[in-house]
């Protein structure tokens, strides 16, 4: 499942993810099949995303001249439609209403799951670390001169920051509020 893989690529551990096929009796009236992507939070399991096969219900409901096409869903006649939402099969030249696959994810749960995965307690150095995947990190690099009161080092750090920005690295931060060396 490509959506399952997408969550893993964002930083979600595959061991904490489950795919759950929704039982037929629990499906929405328009759905032929729905798969939920479940995340195992510390407080329990919750759905991150649902992926529904909505069949031809959506496009069939909104297409013009519905009776000209074999629509598998039970749709109400739509006399106001001005467009035929159909595709032609190039092999047999028949027109058909395509199915819609609808992924539906909540931002809040997704972000919470990502933060849960990225949160790390570095006990050796007594600090908390947020280990985001590089493509999610708002800051791609930090340039930190060893001494803030050394003009030569600070100027070189500023130059390095500009060079990193020029190559398109992303957001680069210059941190010179204290000494690290």
Question: What do these predicted ranges mean?
Answer:
Residues 1-181:
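NTP/phosphate- and nucleic-acid-binding module
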